[in-house]
Amino acid sequence: MDPRIMYYTVLLTTAARVYGQTIKPGVDSVSDQPTWANPLFTYPVDCPAAKLSKVSPSQLRCPRIFDDENRGLVAYPAVIRSLSVGNNLGDIHTQGEYVHKVLYRTTCSTGFFGGQTIEKALVEMKLAPREVGVYDTTTASALYFPAPRCQWYTDNVHNDLTFYYTTAKSVLRDPYTLGFLDSDFIEGKCSKSPCQTHWSNVVWKGDSGVAACDTGSEIKGHIFVDKTSHHVVKATSYGHHPWGLHRACMITFCGKPWIRTDLGDLIAIEYNGGATLLAFPACKDTTVGMRGSLDDFAYLDDLVKSSESREECLEAHAEIIATNSVTPYLLSKFRSPHPGINDVYAMHDGSIYHGKCMTVAIDEVSKDRRTYRAHQTSAFVAWGHPFGDEWGGFHGLHGNDTPVIPDLEKYVAQYKVSMMDKMDIRPVPHPSVQILYNDTDTADITIRKIDSFDLQSLNWSFWPSLSALGGVPILLALVFFLYCCMNRRPSMPAAPQEIPMYHLASRG
């Protein structure tokens, strides 16, 4: 063995026990290209609407944005391997479905003179994860309201049908823990299917899968060493976010040793022409998970966040919340400049959509802006549109004939003002509200949510009949007659009401 390599190996083993990993290679291995930089652009791939969820403005999150400041550091060439992100199904996402439990209720209230009010309500029925699979399910297209049952001079006669039905929904799987990640889950994650969502009557279920233990392809990059302490502080490769190594440690996963980086990625690094495998002290715990599972402030030691871009995003977020509206330009501020699995956002038909999808580095955009070439590829491909049209893409990309890319458009002297077009944001609807019913006449049907006592839910349908009788004298005579001669009006016990309730009301 080369005496130099033997010396470095001893140095690494000794220093790692005390100070963390240190490196002091020979001068001949210093890189001529130590600077790391962001790609021209990033864009999601394989991210259809089924992998997205509607979110409110407060749920938007600005991405981490890192600088390439390397003062006081020396870069050395290295080969970096990462655990392949995926599972035995061959995708970072898991196909699944929402299971809904909803009561479809038709209520009839009949007045003395025959006037009727027909109300149609969707009532949440609490669904526990253990119930999933016990009952047969149907599809949303098979839902319908039962026919009204009306009784003369009687309020609130209910006719109920309870449905268990499914709607398609894909979520991101954590390849390390096999957990599931989605903004609809409580705390945004779930360890095992079936998973409870924010809505009491909606549960998600999907395939469990097994961990993917294959090693990803080798990529060329650099490790950065502090000139004074000789500590290894980070590793970089074009087309990837930087890996912080200030708190790095060794952990065993899938039967192999890995470096757990500051934010939880598992990687392996070779340097000195592949002769030496970078190693750190053993981790004090066995925590593994998707990027960001560890301390969010770990990168602040060296990989300083680009404050200007971060502040622009925070200002955009504040404006979206304050105005309850969004423009393509404002939404572009939420695009992560680093490839990999990232939060992605799109705007469509009054709603903001969020998902976690793979984004790729883009080296070149065609002159007509209709296609792009991703890093380490030669073919140009079209932009992905999650909603099947050519107008709306991710992070503000929009346009029919010539796509408008706000992040690039802002540098053009005569920029397209369409990126400033405002879209008012609607409230996020309940996922179980399916405007599907068996009525042929939908005139005057409205939808409302009942959170408390509502006068509109009472039976006022006899007023049109009274107005046709000729005025106040007849009304007074009628009241006197009812008071003196009629028996007490029968009443029906009110059925227990779940909250919230959605009403589709039509007055007859």
UniProtKB/Swiss-Prot annotation:
Subcellular location: Virion membrane
Membrane topology: Single-pass type I membrane protein
Keywords noted in UniProt: Glycoprotein, Host-virus interaction, Membrane, Signal, Transmembrane, Transmembrane helix, Viral attachment to host cell, Viral envelope protein, Virion, Virus entry into host cell
Pfam families named in the record: Rhabdo_glycop_CD, Rhabdo_glycop_FD
Primary location recorded for the protein, binned into one broad class: virion
Complex formation: Homotrimer. Interacts with matrix protein.
Biological processes, Gene Ontology terms: symbiont entry into host cell; virion attachment to host cell
InterPro entries on file: Rhabdo_glycop_CD, Rhabdo_glycop_FD, Spike_prot
Regions crossing the membrane: 462-482
Segments on the Virion surface face: 21-461
Protein name per UniProt: Glycoprotein
Intravirion side: 483-508
Signal sequence region: 1-20
Family: Belongs to the novirhabdovirus glycoprotein family.
Post-translational modification: Glycosylated by host. Glycosylation is crucial for glycoprotein export at the cell surface.
A cellular component annotation (GO) from this entry: viral envelope
Highest taxon of source: Viruses
Its job: Attaches the virus to host cellular receptor, inducing endocytosis of the virion. In the endosome, the acidic pH induces conformational changes in the glycoprotein trimer, which trigger fusion between virus and cell membrane.
